[in-house]
Curated annotation (Swiss-Prot):
<keyword id="KW-0862">Zinc</keyword>
<dbReference type="GO" id="GO:0003700">
    <property type="term" value="F:DNA-binding transcription factor activity"/>
</dbReference>
<comment type="similarity">
    <text>Belongs to the CONSTANS family.</text>
</comment>
<dbReference type="GO" id="GO:0007623">
    <property type="term" value="P:circadian rhythm"/>
</dbReference>
<feature type="binding site">
    <location>
        <position position="8"/>
    </location>
    <ligand>
        <name>Zn(2+) 1</name>
    </ligand>
</feature>
<feature type="binding site">
    <location>
        <position position="71"/>
    </location>
    <ligand>
        <name>Zn(2+) 2</name>
    </ligand>
</feature>
<feature type="binding site">
    <location>
        <position position="5"/>
    </location>
    <ligand>
        <name>Zn(2+) 1</name>
    </ligand>
</feature>
<feature type="zinc finger region" description="B box-type 1; atypical">
    <location>
        <begin position="5"/>
        <end position="47"/>
    </location>
</feature>
<dbReference type="Pfam" id="PF06203">
    <property type="entry name" value="CCT"/>
</dbReference>
<keyword id="KW-0479">Metal-binding</keyword>
<feature type="binding site">
    <location>
        <position position="51"/>
    </location>
    <ligand>
        <name>Zn(2+) 2</name>
    </ligand>
</feature>
<dbReference type="GO" id="GO:0008270">
    <property type="term" value="F:zinc ion binding"/>
</dbReference>
<dbReference type="GO" id="GO:0048579">
    <property type="term" value="P:negative regulation of long-day photoperiodism, flowering"/>
</dbReference>
<feature type="zinc finger region" description="B box-type 2; atypical">
    <location>
        <begin position="48"/>
        <end position="99"/>
    </location>
</feature>
<feature type="binding site">
    <location>
        <position position="33"/>
    </location>
    <ligand>
        <name>Zn(2+) 1</name>
    </ligand>
</feature>
<dbReference type="Pfam" id="PF22586">
    <property type="entry name" value="ANCHR-like_BBOX"/>
</dbReference>
<protein>
    <recommendedName>
        <fullName>Zinc finger protein CONSTANS-LIKE 9</fullName>
    </recommendedName>
</protein>
């Protein structure tokens, strides 16, 4: 183990991990011991500033160095030690502090609270200077709060719609309350920062927005299902109210076309009869258009529905017949084979079992029993 970090080999080693027996810099210490829960339990402390190979146990206040047990003993208990501080006190009388160990991934502020000598910036040792200059991604609650406030300042109220904008200012303030980011996000999408609530529809498009009239006309939804009326002789057939004249604006997507006659579309409600020509259809400027015509979507039951209903009725009738037969059953005691029973009644037995002819027996049904 040397002066540099055992993991990256670029930064100066600052802490010593007893479980891994490695000297690490603060950055590598955080990245290595934040991998899983087991590594977070490793106990670490400062590395000795004399040998750079053992964990430091004490801190010499006079010399401002962290020492391991061996370096502390050799430096303060050896009478011939020439590395004493500038003060008049002997090395044996130097004030020493015990260095605490830590585990997990503490922030720089938490490390400063564990090692209080890190707060004394005057005359710092190399170890303390490295600790002060090291930049760690702190996870403390104060840093999180500051970070969240900074992000909030970027998102909220940074680029609301100015009052001098060409977009009319309506009664809606939802877009202003939410706020938008001052970046090229909307520019990349080709979108303008306008109020998406469509409450300023009249000022934006110069016309009133009435969804029911735009979609269905003045007749409402019933106008979709009007069939052709009989036209006078010599005249053309009259189309219902929901004809090709009542279409939505081509700027709104997806475009829904309501036609009075079956057209070339993916969804079509058939049932309207009459002559049709290529001129009766109007193409819509959209890739996916839905055209509704003629009959409403609620149809009378089909043949398949009738078959399912009849099958259910047949099954219910069969169950009823089965229950009636079950009630009429008789559970009387019957003799299945009368001839076998007649022969068994006259055979001789021994302890209730049949015996062959000529063998000893203790019961003969043909012999009259005596009553003593």
């Amino acid at each position: 183990m040397g002066y540099m970090c055992d993991f990256c080999g670029e930064q100066r080693s600052m802490v010593y991990c007893r479980s891994d027996a490695a000297c690490l810099c603060l950055s590598c210490d955080r990245s290595v011991h934040s991998a899983n829960a087991l590594s977070k339990r490793h106990s670490r402390t400062l590395v000795c500033e004399r040998c750079n190979a053992q964990p430091a146990t004490v801190r010499c206040v006079e010399e401002r160095v962290s020492l391991c047990q061996n370096c502390d003993w050799s430096g303060h208990n050896n009478s011939n030690n020439n590395n004493s501080s500038s003060s008049s006190t002997s090395p044996q009388q130097h004030k020493r502090q015990t260095i605490s160990c830590y585990s997990g991934c503490p922030s720089s502020s938490e490390l400063a609270s564990i090692w209080s000598f890190c707060l004394d910036l005057a005359g710092q040792s190399i170890c303390e200077q490295e600790l002060g200059m090291m930049n760690i991604d702190d996870d403390g609650p104060t840093d999180k709060k500051t970070c969240n406030e900074d992000k909030k300042d970027v998102l909220v109220g940074s680029s609301s719609i100015p009052e001098t904008s060409s977009v009319p200012q309506g009664k809606s303030s939802s877009a202003k309350d939410v706020g938008m980011c001052e970046d090229d996000f909307y520019g990349n999408l080709g979108m303008d920062e306008v109020d998406m609530a469509l409450e300023n529809y009249e000022e934006l498009f110069g016309t009133a927005f009435n969804p029911s009239e735009e979609l269905f006309g003045h007749g409402g939804i019933d106008s979709l299902f009007h069939k052709h009326q009989t036209a006078p002789e010599g005249g053309n057939s009259v189309q219902p109210a929901g004809s090709n004249d009542s279409f939505m604006s081509s700027k709104t997507e997806p475009i829904i076309c309501f036609a009075s006659k079956p057209a070339h579309s993916n969804i079509s409600f058939s049932g309207v009869t009459g002559e049709s020509s290529a001129g009766d259809f109007q193409e819509c400027g959209a890739s996916s258009s839905i055209q509704l015509s003629g009959e409403p979507p609620w149809y009378p039951p089909t043949l398949q529905d009738n078959n399912a209903c009849s099958h259910s009725v047949t099954r219910n009738n069969a169950v009823m017949r089965y229950k009636e037969k079950k009630k009429a059953r008789k559970f009387d005691k019957r003799v299945r084979y009368a001839s076998r029973k007649a022969r068994a009644d006259v055979r001789r037995r021994v302890k209730g079992r049949f015996v062959k002819a000529g063998e000893a027996y203790d019961y003969d049904p043909l012999t009259p029993t005596r009553s003593y």
